[in-house]
C-alpha cells in the first residue's frame, strides 16, 4: 500500500510537471503540434496534455520533491540511462505527454509522442508497472466513467490511440476510449 501510494503520488507530480512545462513558454514544438491537430485549449486541459522538454529535468524535479529514487524508478516515468550508468532520465524525454488515467482518476502511466520524424515508433507508453498494465487499461476510461454515471451510455466507441480519442471527444463523441495500440482484451 505504501509503495502503491508513493508511485501514484510520483505519477501525479509528474503529470503536473509536464502540464507546467506545456504552459512554460518553452514548449513551442509541442504547442505547434497541438495547433496542427486543431485541439482547443479546453480539450488540452480536459485531457491534461503536457510536455517533456528534455531527459533530465523530470528526474531532478522528482528527487527535489523528496521522492525516493527506488520509487521514482518503479513508477516507470523515469528510467536509468543505457549510456550513463546510474543516471536517471525521463522515459518520455522530449515528447508530447498524454497522461493515462484509470477509472479511479489516478494517473497510472504516460503516453508520449515524438514531435519530429524519427526512425522509431511515434508513440511510447510507460512500461508496465505495479499500477499500470496496458492490456487492462483503456485511455479515457476516467471521463467515460463520469459520463456514464451522469447520463448513462448506450454505446462506446473504441479506437486505437490517444489522438483518435481526443479528436473524437472534441468533435462531440464523448463516449470514446482507446486500447492504446493493443488488441482488445477480456479485462478491458
Language-model segments: what does each one mean?
Residues 2-4, 8-43:
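Non-catalytic interaction/clamp surfaces of large macromolecular machines
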Amino acid at each position: 500500500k505504501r509503495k502503491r501510494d508513493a508511485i501514484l503520488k510520483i505519477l501525479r507530480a509528474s503529470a503536473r510537471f509536464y502540464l507546467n512545462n506545456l504552459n512554460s513558454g518553452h514548449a513551442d514544438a509541442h504547442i505547434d503540434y497541438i495547433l496542427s491537430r486543431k485541439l482547443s485549449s479546453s480539450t488540452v486541459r480536459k485531457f491534461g496534455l503536457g510536455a517533456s522538454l528534455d531527459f533530465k529535468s523530470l528526474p531532478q524535479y522528482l528527487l527535489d520533491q523528496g521522492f525516493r529514487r527506488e520509487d521514482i524508478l518503479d513508477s516507470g516515468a523515469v528510467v536509468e540511462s543505457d549510456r550513463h550508468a546510474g543516471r536517471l532520465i525521463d522515459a518520455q524525454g522530449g515528447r508530447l505527454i498524454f497522461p493515462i488515467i484509470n477509472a479511479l482518476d489516478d494517473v497510472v502511466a504516460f503516453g508520449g509522442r515524438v514531435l519530429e520524424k524519427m526512425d522509431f515508433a511515434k508513440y511510447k507508453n510507460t512500461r508496465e508497472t505495479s499500477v499500470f498494465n496496458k492490456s487492462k487499461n483503456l485511455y479515457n476510461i476516467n471521463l467515460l466513467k463520469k459520463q456514464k454515471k451522469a447520463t448513462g451510455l448506450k454505446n462506446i466507441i473504441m479506437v486505437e490511440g490517444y489522438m483518435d480519442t481526443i479528436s473524437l471527444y472534441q468533435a462531440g463523441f464523448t463516449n470514446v476510449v482507446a486500447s492504446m495500440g493493443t488488441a482488445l482484451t477480456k479485462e478491458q
